[in-house]
Amino acid sequence: MTDVAIINYGAQHDYPAMLHELANGLHVFSHNPLAHTAGLGSYEHVEDCEFVPYAELRIRQLARTRRFAHIITDNEYDLERAARIREDLGIPGQSARSARQFRDKVVMKQTAGRTVATPRYARLTTIVDLTRFIADNDYPVVVKPVSQGGSRDIVVLRDENDLMAFSRRHWREDLMVEDFVDGEIYHVDAILAPGYRFVASSRYLRDCLGVLSGQNNGSLQLDPAGKLSRRLEEFLDRVLEAFDTPEVGAYHLEVFRTPEDEFVLCEIASRVGGSRIPALTRLTYGLDLHTTWLRLSCGLPVDPAPNTPPAALRGSIGIVPQGRPVRAPQSLPFDWVEHYQVNEQLALGAVAQNSTSNLCFALVRGADTAEVEQRLLQVEEWILDNLIEADGPARLPAP
């Protein structure tokens, strides 16, 4: 029997199905409760799993009586922990050095800067580091935690007034600053392994940071055979040349495209892209990113990577929490909407807390990127015109 330890985050994963050949040797520790656990070697729902060391301690205890072949995780915040366990137990997979290159955004920029353009940046110890950076580089700048995701706790400072307002916030010990880069933002999602290569490129509908100020956002897939997709794929390869990469890797790359048509690294993560990216990929390419990545990581066979042009492209639009008591319509009147979901868990009056906060979201189909974008904007307009006013408290944080 092959034993595999899994530190899980995703609430919908079905590990007995995804890794069915190994099911009775899977030992799963999950941040979110899982519905499909029958047949697993062991399973524990660990409250706040990504914040507490329990899963790591239990895996090390279990390793006294069994030989784990693999330690895997779907969660960016567990990459370093999983790598540390692997190295201590002599298990192949992503190293701690590699995980840190992708997790610490200062180290990430230092690493990527060997092969591609990055914004100017600095790690912050005190407010003086920030003011010196601004004096040297001018406004606007972006201040953010070095290891956070989902646009959480990111602040754009455009002038002295913004700086003074920022100085009233609680100081954190994990901050960095970088130039604000003007331009469109693209994302490239890939799974790379010996004999396997899948790369797909998309453009964000708007700036991800706009969600925090009330802008709706989403993304739209690019034609995989188009010149821009090929350029983005080449940029991904150049970025990864600078990194220590595991034999099997999933990557979510975010790229600025400046008005001068130059690419500048935003960030790269060593995991599957979040939000609607997995769902859009399944609809267009018939590929489950998580299943493919985890099966390859465990040495299990997968179907060949898609290599024919897709019949259609897709995109997503998320309507941000409105900050006032409203409800989203329960359905949409468009036959090209392939999925629509209302966030029933959202408190009335909630406001956005990160780039994935939503009142509702829709996935749409189109013949090409231009039609997808037009339909996303049509859906956005229709939903906003049909919000339902409701009684309730105002300005609660979104879950």
PLM regions and their residue ranges:
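ATP-binding N-terminal substructure of ATP-dependent carboxylate-amine bond-forming enzymes
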Residues: 1-97, 128, 300-303, 367-368, ...
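Short, well-ordered beta-strand elements within core beta-sheets of diverse protein domains
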Residues: 155, 179, 282, 360-367
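Peripheral (often C-terminal) accessory segments that flank ATP-dependent C-N-forming ligase machineries
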Residues: 5, 133, 294-399
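Active-site nucleotide/adenylate-binding loops and adjacent lid/helix of ATP-dependent enzymes
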Residues: 102-182, 193-195, 222-238, 377-380
